[in-house]
Amino acid sequence: MKYRDLREFIALLEQRGELKRIQQSIDPYLEMTEIADRTLRVGGPALLFENPKGYDIPVLCNLFGTPQRVALGMGQEEVGALRDVGKLLAFLKEPDPPKGFRDLVEKLPQFKQILNMPTKRLSKAPCQEQVLQGDDVDLATLPVMHCWPQDVAPLVSWGLTVTRGPCKSRQNLGIYRQQVLGKNKLIMRWLSHRGGALDFQDWCQAHPGERFPVAVALGADPATLLAAVTPVPDSLSEYAFAGLLRGHKSEVVKCLSCDLEVPASAEIVLEGYIEPGETAPEGPYGDHTGYYNEVERFPVFTVTHLTQRDRPIYHSTYTGRPPDEPAVLGLALNEVFVPLLQKQFPEIVDFYLPPEGCSYRMAVVTMKKQYPGHAKRVMMGVWSFLRQFMYTKFVIVCDDDINARDWQDVIWALTTRMDPARDTLLIENTPIDYLDFASPVSGLGSKMGLDATNKWPGETQREWGHPIVMDEAVRARVDTLWNELDIFANDKDAQ
């Protein structure tokens, strides 16, 4: 699916019946959340609120409200094709040199995709068609959603934040929520291990007391947004990866106030700085956990310039108890993670992050077990391989005869193949999401690994059970009789 910017993507969704325009006046205060939530829970379309109450800028919600739309945003027609995106990422993370001519021919598509990686800088860009600066900047003109009754203030939710560390050539793109604090101020909620926060820490060490340049793009194209939430290798720019997804180079433009580059086709861009030491209490907000989070201090982002397209569109979302849009994104990105893990751990058959577990707090892994203790090695591998799994509290490991995505299968394995004392691994004092109020200390808690695999000699002294399986000849015989038996005839008559 080819598109160049958010507007082209919206048009393509509309052609497919995947976008609904809403003409009624809908309030960004709570009403949009309720409508978007009801729509997402039944797999409904993206929503374009054309007449937000009190504003003249349309609001786009539920853009990634189904895994299929996430796949389309990544340039794929089917969710299953996201495995190919994962294979490409695995290749970029650790490229294997061709082993011969035939292997070179097979790898040519990957090498051709890499040609789309460099960015293209434009001298003029749609995102700078209108320019406001200084006292003319007023965030109150944007229809920023106030999502839940006890939220402290309106919240920018899809802000693509662009930063660069003092010793880095590549820019970092990240999605961080931002509380509206005033006319030209937001609170930048980035966790300490995220790219933007690390760039800021490095800047403060290299340039103590100096302002840290930041830009935030609202309404960037889907490929760039999705690249920002995908585990791209540290050596690869998210802009470059977005070019791979999109099939053509990412077009960027230099900010008016600094050297950072922003997506040329973004609907709205906020430029400004963070003053070292300037922080403010952020929250509470209803979060993806289904609870209001605690209040914590984060840096303040001061906006000096607001640039935008003519007749801009404001892109927004809400977070709440799954399913919400982050949970849907997690479900789709799950397919990207599988090939990455399999390249490092070929014994892994499948990997599943249940959306009910906030899409990262629990993982189910199926594997081809090869030796005693193998399941524990896989647990450790999951926790340590990607930063995205640093906050995963529970890892369940099963054999490959179990369907990782079927709870009936997983629970059967847990209850028949596990001894709680022998097969439970507990690790204390590990990094935990500070939003996880179940941990005894903010940001620090425990992890649990559950070995639900069949036990090998050395792991048990008992004779292990043999699964019940019907004789194949009998199964074949019943297959030939099945239609003739017409066992469900009464059900058909009732219909």
UniProtKB/Swiss-Prot annotation:
Binds 1 prenylated FMN per subunit. It catalyses: a 4-hydroxy-3-(all-trans-polyprenyl)benzoate + H(+) = a 2-(all-trans-polyprenyl)phenol + CO2. It is an enzyme of class 4 (lyase). It comes from the Bacteria. GO terms for cellular component: cytosol; plasma membrane. Pathway: Cofactor biosynthesis; ubiquinone biosynthesis. Prenylated FMN binds at I175, Y176, R177, R189, W190, L191, R194, G195. Mn(2+) binds at N172, E238. GO terms for biological process: ubiquinone biosynthetic process. The keyword Cell membrane applies. The active site is at D287. GO terms for molecular function: 3-octaprenyl-4-hydroxybenzoate carboxy-lyase activity; metal ion binding. Keywords: Cell membrane, Decarboxylase, Flavoprotein, FMN, Lyase, Manganese, Membrane, Metal-binding, Ubiquinone biosynthesis. Catalyzes the decarboxylation of 3-octaprenyl-4-hydroxy benzoate to 2-octaprenylphenol, an intermediate step in ubiquinone biosynthesis. Belongs to the UbiD family. This is 3-octaprenyl-4-hydroxybenzoate carboxy-lyase. The gene is ubiD.
